[in-house]
């Protein structure tokens, strides 16, 4: 049995996450009272006719505060039944959440006559703290549209060929902000920038002319070797510590050239020595 617990602040994309999981064969329950989590797991184990039942539940601020505060012990109870259980926590910055509520005109579950929307969003963080602290995977949706979020969930949760730590090597551009869910961040903005070559500007690190230009730069090769040596040594230690997900982010200015090139090379090299290595380019349209 596999159980995925989806949580996060209102407006972060939980409904989209459940939709993706349902489309991929999961039996989904929205707004499950957290106190029922062990009972749900027990019943799914006993009564299901499926060899590998897939269940996803959403647990969020609509729960009783007393249930949310007990989440650590409830999760421990579920995992004691030898159930594969992943906790997915979605979030976005407060400005983005405020904008999303303004656009949809939906009421925040914690807002009332004495509490503004901004205060409700802040209070929600405290309520969901016990879940966020135990999340196996955190996805920040600030810069993701609906389709990018769906693709990210499928990539990180559903496309693992084998059990074990899932590694994501991700390129990004600093001008759009660092990925807040990254475990390791490497800044490669000091390297020669193909952007300043007019014939390369419109291309990306996936294109052969850009790759050839960067491969010819000694500093780029030195940077690649240093990052690869570090990852080759230390990523197995992350896996040995029972980490479910590890994100390695490579950043340049715009996220189109240098970071993309290095991310591709590192991903391909790591796939030869580690299981479950995926590659993603955040800022390529």
Swiss-Prot record:
Family statement: Belongs to the RapZ-like family.
Function statement: Displays ATPase and GTPase activities.
Record: residues binding ATP: 8-15
UniProt xrefs under SUPFAM superfamilies: P-loop containing nucleoside triphosphate hydrolases (SSF52540)
InterPro entries in alphabetical order: P-loop_NTPase, RapZ-like, RapZ-like_N, RapZ_C
Record protein name field: Nucleotide-binding protein Pfl01_0854
Domain of life: Bacteria
Natural source organism: Pseudomonas fluorescens (strain Pf0-1)
Keyword Nucleotide-binding: yes
Gene3D superfamilies: P-loop containing nucleotide triphosphate hydrolases
GO function term, MF aspect, one: ATP binding
Keyword Nucleotide-binding found: yes
Keyword entries, A-Z: ATP-binding, GTP-binding, Nucleotide-binding
HAMAP family (UniProt xref): RapZ_like
Sequence positions that bind GTP: 60-63
Annotated disulfide bonds: none
């Amino acid at each position: 049995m596999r159980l995925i617990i989806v949580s996060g602040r209102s407006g972060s994309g939980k409904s989209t996450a459940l939709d993706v999981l349902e489309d991929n064969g999961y039996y989904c329950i929205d707004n499950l009272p957290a106190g029922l989590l062990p009972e749900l797991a027990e019943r799914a184990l006993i009564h299901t006719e499926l060899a590998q039942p897939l269940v996803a539940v959403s647990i969020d601020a609509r729960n009783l505060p007393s249930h949310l505060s007990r989440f650590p012990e409830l999760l421990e109870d579920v995992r004691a039944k030898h159930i594969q259980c992943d906790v997915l926590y979605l979030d976005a910055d407060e400005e983005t959440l405020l904008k999303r509520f303004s656009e949809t005109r939906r009421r925040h579950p914690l807002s009332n006559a004495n509490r503004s929307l901004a205060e409700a969003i802040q209070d929600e963080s405290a309520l969901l703290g016990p879940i966020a602290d135990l999340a196996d995977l955190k996805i920040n949706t600030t810069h993701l549209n609906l389709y990018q979020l769906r693709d990210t969930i499928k990539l990180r949760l559903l496309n693992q060929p084998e059990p074990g730590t899932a590694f994501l090597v991700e390129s990004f551009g600093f001008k759009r902000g660092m990925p807040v869910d990254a475990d390791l961040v490497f800044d490669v903005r000091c390297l020669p920038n193909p952007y300043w070559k007019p014939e390369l500007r419109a291309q990306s690190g996936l294109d052969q002319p850009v790759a050839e230009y960067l491969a010819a730069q000694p500093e780029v090769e030195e940077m690649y070797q240093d990052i690869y040596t570090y990852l080759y040594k230390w990523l197995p230690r992350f896996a040995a510590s029972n980490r479910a997900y590890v994100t390695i982010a490579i950043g340049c200015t715009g996220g189109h050239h240098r970071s993309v090139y290095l991310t591709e090379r590192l991903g391909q090299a790591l796939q030869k020595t580690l299981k479950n290595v995926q590659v993603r380019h955040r800022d390529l349209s």
